[in-house]
Amino acid sequence: MGRSLKKGPFVDDHLMKKVEAQQGAEKKKVIKTWSRRSTIFPSFVGFTIAVYDGRKHVPVYIQEDMVGHKLGEFAPTRTYRGHVADDKKTKR
């Protein structure tokens, strides 16, 4: 179930302030955030935002097709290393 349209999209205030401060800057730095729940706004396009995945900050370059999605969608929290191979043949 999605968010109500009358409420509008959510973005943390501290993240929005960091993005607005970077818009006037000549050189764009990586913006570090722990807010995986924030929605990507059109003003974020072109920035690199480092999203925390529980261990480290994963750099995510924001593109136009990401607008409307959440930041956490682009920083996976779990590492999948594949299923363990069966060693039934080698045990005989």
Curated annotation (Swiss-Prot):
SUPFAM superfamilies, per database record: Ribosomal protein S19
GO biological process: ribosomal small subunit assembly; translation
Gene Ontology MF term list: rRNA binding; structural constituent of ribosome
Pfam families: Ribosomal_S19
General function of this protein: Protein S19 forms a complex with S13 that binds strongly to the 16S ribosomal RNA.
Cross-referenced NCBIfam families: rpsS_bact
UniProt-recorded name of the protein: Small ribosomal subunit protein uS19
Organism from which the protein derives: Enterococcus faecalis (strain ATCC 700802 / V583)
Gene symbol of the encoding locus: rpsS
